[in-house]
């Protein structure tokens, strides 16, 4: 069972639809008992980092997520991926979950590329990662973001190029993060979700 975490700032149903399409058992919940009993967790997220962290705290989920991430696989998606890091500088400075070392900062792409970075972009593999077993260099996935992770290369399974090297898929222990939306990324994204479900 994969539990999709419901804290008020996630694109829950598109993720659930993708898992349902794959035949993966899942639920959407904010209940601590469901999070504890789940085999794996997905932390979706849309919007602003400070608001999302506040909602996660107010839902009483911050500490249980940190604890469960030591025991089971966790995937953060888009803003949910950014929340895995130590802190973000979006609208000031806000502490994150601290599950992957690094920060989240406004992108400064070269060549006057506009932000937000919206659309399809190709993945460039970096460090070995189980989630990329079905993915080839150059496969395209779908992005929507203005901020990006700043972290050691050893934590980056794949980058994309958007006038700068953008960490697209990050990892640390049981914790994985997709800056892109796997649930909106066609065959490539579904393959990543299927592999995550089978970990």
Regions found by a protein language model. Name each.
Residues 1-5, 75, 142:
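Conserved beta-strand elements of the Class I
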Residues 2-24, 180-185:
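N-terminal beta1-alpha1 ligand-phosphate binding loop
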Residues 26-37:
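Short acidic low-complexity segments
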Residues 178-199:
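Acyltransferase
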Residues 165-171:
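Short, surface-exposed beta-strand/loop micro-motifs that present aromatic residues
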Residues 40:
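Short, Asp-centered acidic motifs that coordinate Mg2+ and/or phosphate
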């Amino acid at each position: 069972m994969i539990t999709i975490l419901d804290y008020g700032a996630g694109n829950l149903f598109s993720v659930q639809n993708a898992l349902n399409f794959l035949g993966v058992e899942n639920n959407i919940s904010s209940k601590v008992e469901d999070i504890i009993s789940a085999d794996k967790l997905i932390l979706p997220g849309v919007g602003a980092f400070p608001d999302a962290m506040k909602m996660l705290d107010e839902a009483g989920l911050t500490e249980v997520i940190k604890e469960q991430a030591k025991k089971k696989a966790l995937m953060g998606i888009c803003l949910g991926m950014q929340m895995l890091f130590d802190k973000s500088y979006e609208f000031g400075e806000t502490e994150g979950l601290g599950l992957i070392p690094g920060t989240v900062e406004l992108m400064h792409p070269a060549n006057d590329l506009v932000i937000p970075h919206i659309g399809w972009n190709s993945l460039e593999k970096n460090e070995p990662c189980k989630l990329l077993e079905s993915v080839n260099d150059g496969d395209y996935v779908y992005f929507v973001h203005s901020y990006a992770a700043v972290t050691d290369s050893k934590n980056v399974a794949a980058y994309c190029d958007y006038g700068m090297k953008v960490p697209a898929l990050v990892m640390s222990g049981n914790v994985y993060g997709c800056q892109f939306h796997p649930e909106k990324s066609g065959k490539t994204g579904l393959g990543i979700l299927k592999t995550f479900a089978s970990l």
